[in-house]
């Protein structure tokens, strides 16, 4: 990314949020836009695809506190001063040459380098001078997938189709034409920086000969024009482990955006959304369900067959069970990450018949009389009696 692009891109506007937006607001805005603009939801729509890429790029920066801080500092530092096209320019910090990519100054950001102070410290030899050019690791990428309740509980392998910067398939990320190789820059000897003195200060600045990369490509790849990166659509197979919960993020190392000229790729983060189930609920590793029973079954007791994630199991309802009681079946819940499984929690709920035939009504009347004769009072001890 050129210095002007870095400064002029408004990631906040891209997501439709203010510059003071919280992480939750940023995440909510991104999720809505990503769902609306995803290539799978807009097949053949190139405008939606480009917008999806821009939204993903904005989220990758603003969702990372360190990257967001550096982005804000960069815009404050350069945007307000009418910066010259070539960089800091006359009167600035050493007059960088025209065409230098400010992304090379901030190239270590995705790899977890420090903030703007570290960068300026390097320019003015504060805390030591860089001796080697760090590879520019690719940016992290975020995407989402929705699973069924049982898929999330038991684990599943899903294909994810996504469009992002990836290593060039022609040069395999080197940036050089097949059959050739980049050569070490003779000016900086591969360090990517050159040093000079001005008065009492020693300066380190990106090398003009190699644009701070440490190497020179004499014969660039015709497909990626020397960057080593191409935008392409790919399908990644993602293994979702058993027991994943709604909103959980899964990291796939090295599956994010490709690094510059063969540098390491970023990571892919997949946020999992879990659909509700008609039968089951979940409480941590425990599986929950509500079991309809009759009054007679609660009073007399019974055994009822109920579903689990891997078949059915008989649940014994003891005689005299109260409505709303929860019965526990150990080890028949959601698989745990370290092995074993949670429990199945079965809550009994009495189902009141809406219509009874004459025989049933007569039997129920006889039961009511017998209940009174036994001295049973359902409201005994009730505070409202």
From Swiss-Prot:
Zinc finger (CR-type) in chain: 155-233
Domain J: 10-75
PROSITE patterns for the chain: DNAJ_1, DNAJ_2, ZF_CR
CXXCXGXG motif repeats: 168-175, 185-192, 207-214, 221-228
Record-linked Pfam families: DnaJ, DnaJ_C, DnaJ_CXXCXGXG
UniProt domain comment: The J domain is necessary and sufficient to stimulate DnaK ATPase activity. Zinc center 1 plays an important role in the autonomous, DnaK-independent chaperone activity of DnaJ. Zinc center 2 is essential for interaction with DnaK and for DnaJ activity.
HAMAP family recorded: DnaJ
Protein name, per record: Chaperone protein DnaJ 2
Organism: Nocardia farcinica (strain IFM 10152)
